[in-house]
């Protein structure tokens, strides 16, 4: 189905896809090798050292509901001059430590942060994984695990999660992928909510992945009827290139045409990115 609106290509984790241009990202959450990662813009003229100091200060600042600031236990550099630090951020759990690092690429106007919390005593192992991950990040790459305009060009791991949401003009879209130990067909997610009417349920191949598509119509209190579309691929065990995939979109019934266009654009353009492992 050809879309009547211009589209924009997006990337979340291991996948590329397109959405109608009006839809804008509401935020993403990314995790690879059990490490939380996030890309942020680096303002023109900003120095990597300045970006690091700001990120470290934000991490150590008291969290909501707490008056205690985090404790910096060691600041150092990973191979390649990537600034990093060990911290204790949970006063009630002195056995927990957090490793934070930030790789900034001024030429690309971007920086990527990496953060993980774990038990004290395994610091050397964590630093080794961080070093490998930091050097694998390539600004502007169209391969690997995407963080936005850059990506970790590294072997897919058995532990990866990626999610992103979009919204515009009453339409909401959510993207979720996660590696699994066993296939999860999301049967609980496919159960009809009370009062919902099943419009369509079918097997549908999306980007080479055989999943289940479901469309329902349900009451939306005070707003009439709402349409909810869902597609799920169960995933393959411990396979970063075939994670569990959950794609969803929703809108009020009067926006059915725009919702259909958005949905078909998403599913018809969904593609696995080249791993590009090196």
Where are these regions (language model features)?
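Surface-exposed amphipathic alpha-helical segments
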Residues: 2, 13, 18-27, 114-154, ...
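N-terminal mature-domain "stem" immediately C-terminal to a signal peptide or N-terminal signal-anchor/transmembrane
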Residues: 2-47
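Low-complexity, Gly/Pro
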Residues: 28, 98-113, 275-277
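A short acidic-to-branched-hydrophobic micro-motif
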Residues: 29-64, 113-117, 161-195, 213, ...
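Short, surface-exposed beta-strand/loop "edge" segments at domain boundaries and coil↔beta transitions
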Residues: 42-46, 93-98, 120-125, 221-227, ...
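Signature of long, low-cysteine stretches enriched in small and polar/charged residues
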Residues: 56-107, 172-239
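Acidic, serine/threonine- and glycine-rich low-complexity intrinsically disordered segments
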Residues: 111-212, 223
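Acidic, serine/threonine-rich low-complexity disordered tracts
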Residues: 210-215, 223-227, 238-240, 250-253, ...
């Amino acid at each position: 189905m050809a879309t009547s609106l211009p589209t924009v290509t997006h990337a979340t984790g291991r996948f590329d896809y397109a959405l109608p241009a009006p839809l804008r990202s509401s935020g993403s959450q990314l995790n690879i090798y059990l490490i939380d990662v996030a890309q942020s813009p680096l303002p023109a003229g900003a120095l990597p050292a300045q970006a690091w100091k700001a990120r470290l200060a934000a991490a150590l600042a008291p969290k909501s509901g707490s008056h205690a600031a985090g404790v910096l236990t060691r600041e150092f550099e990973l191979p390649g001059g990537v600034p990093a630090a060990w911290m204790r951020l949970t006063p009630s759990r002195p056995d927990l430590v957090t490793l934070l690092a930030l790789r900034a690429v001024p030429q690309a106007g971007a920086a990527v942060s990496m953060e993980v919390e774990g038990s004290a005593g395994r610091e050397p192992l964590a630093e080794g994984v961080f070093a490998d991950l930091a050097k694998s990040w390539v600004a502007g790459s169209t391969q690997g695990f995407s963080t936005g305009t850059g990506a970790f060009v590294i072997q897919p791991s058995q532990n990866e999660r990626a999610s992103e949401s979009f919204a515009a003009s009453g339409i909401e879209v959510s993207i979720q992928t996660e590696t699994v130990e066993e296939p999860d067909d999301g049967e609980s997610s496919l159960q009809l909510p009370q009062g919902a009417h099943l419009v369509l349920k079918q097997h549908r191949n999306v980007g080479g992945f055989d999943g289940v598509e479901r469309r329902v119509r349900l009451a939306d209190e005070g707003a009439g009827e709402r349409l909810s579309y869902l597609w799920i691929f169960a995933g393959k065990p411990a396979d970063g290139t075939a994670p569990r995939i959950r794609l969803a979109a929703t809108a009020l019934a009067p926006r059915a045409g725009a919702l259909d266009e958005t949905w078909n654009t998403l599913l018809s353009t969904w593609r696995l990115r080249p791993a590009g492992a090196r």
